[in-house]
Amino acid sequence: TERQGCPVCNSTKGENSIIKFLQDYNINFVFQMKFDDLKYKSNLYYDFYIPYLNTLIEYDGEFHYFDIFKNGSFETSLIRDELKNKYAISNNIDLIRIPYWDFNNIESILTQKLLSKIKEDN
């Protein structure tokens, strides 16, 4: 299905927290990044891509871990996540996955994983 409206406005609580972190640290990012050669029935999107660091970020809500909707989407979600993991590895792109239970730790996770990469580059 085609995404409607402003993707940032439609983002989740976890995604909003990540957006705030990236903006607070003036880290340029692409929201809802897609690669033309990454598909499963349709295009797959990563939540965030930071070109400068060649890093993707995925915030994984509960539906990535539990069959919440009971409509077959859980199995599809598992397949999509695995394809995204493999794509990142095969293209030498760092992928940071943040599970929903780490919502309160988003800032510390990103500080550790992103800011250390920025320091390495300088």
Show which residues each predicted segment covers.
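Nucleic-acid endo/exonuclease domains
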Residues: 1-122
